[in-house]
Amino acid sequence: MPRPKKCRQLSSCVPCSLFKPNGIPAANLSQILLAADEFEALELGDVQRLSQLEAAAQMGISRQTFGYLLASARQKVATAITQGLVLKLPTPNDKDPI
């Protein structure tokens, strides 16, 4: 039985709710959901350029968990861009199980 997930400390505000290819209605496209903790990992690791150790400490998780979140987020973003899918971003109204 897996251990329960730790609460993550999230501070990033999402500027919009989704990204999609131009000129195609979102209803006609498949979606990829980026979780709130994955979005935070991208923000801390790639935008703020923190080390994995610093970013993990800021989120209140282990460095290894941060690495998994960052890899998952990068894979989802790359898939959405290369395959022309909708990338749905977390909003404050979303129910996040974390």
Swiss-Prot record:
Short name of any one Pfam family annotated for the protein: DUF134
InterPro entries: UPF0251, WH-like_DNA-bd_sf
Gene3D superfamilies: Winged helix-like DNA-binding domain superfamily/Winged helix DNA-binding domain
Stored PANTHER family: PTHR37478, UPF0251 PROTEIN TK0562
Family, as annotated: Belongs to the UPF0251 family.
Protein name: UPF0251 protein SO_0727
Source organism per UniProt: Shewanella oneidensis (strain ATCC 700550 / JCM 31522 / CIP 106686 / LMG 19005 / NCIMB 14063 / MR-1)
